[in-house]
Amino acid sequence: MFSLQDVITTTKTTLAAMPKGYLPKWLLFISIVSVFNSIQTYVSGLELTRKVYERKPTETTHLSARTFGTWTFISCVIRFYGAMYLNEPHIFELVFMSYMVALFHFGSELLIFRTCKLGKGFMGPLVVSTTSLVWMYKQREYYTGVAW
């Protein structure tokens, strides 16, 4: 069993091994938040997921919420690896593509399928995916040594 001191020491060591700069810390933060978002889709019903798809909330079912939670958790794992190994070009590109998929999903739900509207449930994913994409686009060469 791990003691609290073991957890603290491991956490400090892990954080020290991360690439320098704020982008890896951002990716780690988003990854951690995504874990809680994933869990809530399994345990708290439909209320929070329906806030994202606010224009047509009845189209959100328990199954679609859990599927969304699973997808969010997979994205969380990808972004965690990105936080730890952002200097690796393949990992960087995988994280970047995960945000492109997220932006495409939410953009299509807003503009094509019309299940979302610009409310507070939708703005979080929109701001996170857009901010992350722009930031990563501008910082690729810094972290990977490879220009676009």
UniProtKB/Swiss-Prot annotation:
One GO cellular component term: endoplasmic reticulum membrane
KW Repeat (keyword) present: no
Membrane topology, Lumenal segments: 47-92, 137-148
Keywords, in A-Z order: Endoplasmic reticulum, Lipid biosynthesis, Lipid metabolism, Membrane, Steroid biosynthesis, Steroid metabolism, Sterol biosynthesis, Sterol metabolism, Transmembrane, Transmembrane helix
Superkingdom per UniProt: Eukaryota
Localization: Endoplasmic reticulum membrane
Protein's GO biological process: ergosterol biosynthetic process
Bilayer topology annotation: Multi-pass membrane protein
Cytoplasmic topology ranges: 1-25, 114-120
An example Gene Ontology molecular-function term: protein-macromolecule adaptor activity
Endpoints of the signal sequence: none
UniProt key word Phosphoprotein: no
InterPro entries (UniProt xref): Erg28
Main location: endoplasmic reticulum
TM region(s), chain numbering: 26-46, 93-113, 121-136
Its job: Part of the third module of ergosterol biosynthesis pathway that includes the late steps of the pathway. The third module or late pathway involves the ergosterol synthesis itself through consecutive reactions that mainly occur in the endoplasmic reticulum (ER) membrane. Firstly, the squalene synthase ERG9 catalyzes the condensation of 2 farnesyl pyrophosphate moieties to form squalene, which is the precursor of all steroids.
General remark: Present with 377 molecules/cell in log phase SD medium.
Family (UniProt): Belongs to the ERG28 family.
Subunit structure comment from the entry: Heterotetramer of ERG25, ERG26, ERG27 and ERG28. ERG28 acts as a scaffold to tether ERG27 and other 4,4-demethylation-related enzymes, forming a demethylation enzyme complex, in the endoplasmic reticulum. Interacts with ERG25, ERG26 and ERG27. Also interacts with ERG1, ERG3, ERG5, ERG6 and ERG11.
Designated name of the protein: Ergosterol biosynthetic protein 28
Organism: Saccharomyces cerevisiae (strain ATCC 204508 / S288c)
Taxonomic lineage from the root: Eukaryota, Fungi, Dikarya, Ascomycota, Saccharomycotina
Gene: ERG28
